[in-house]
Regions:
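Glycine-rich, highly charged phosphate/nucleotide-binding loops
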Residues: 60-68
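Glycine-rich, flexible N-terminal cofactor/catalytic loop recognition
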Residues: 1-59
Length: 85
């Protein structure tokens, strides 16, 4: 069974502006791919989300894309978040 990729927008300013649906998704997926893990870690800690996270940005996009597509084909549930928005 193929996995699913969830595109999860994050708040630009106030962390409390995130939707409950996004919070649920971030808790339920197996892995979070984040543009900047330092910024994203603040969000995850604020909401006590312990899902594993990896970096995914313009400098590692080629390598990570192949890796993530392979993991999605293996059934991984993955959320992709950016720094803000």
């Amino acid at each position: 069974m193929e996995g699913k990729l969830f595109l999860c927008p994050t708040p630009i300013g106030n962390l409390e502006d995130i939707t409950q649906r996004v919070l649920n998704t971030l808790r339920e997926v197996e892995l979070i791919a984040a543009e900047d893990t330092r910024n994203s870690l603040n969000l995850l800690r604020h909401f006590s989300i312990t899902t594993p996270m990896i970096s995914y940005h313009q400098h590692n996009e080629r390598e990570r894309t192949e890796e993530l597509i392979g993991r999605l084909k293996d059934g991984l549930q993955l959320a992709l978040i950016t720094d803000a928005g």
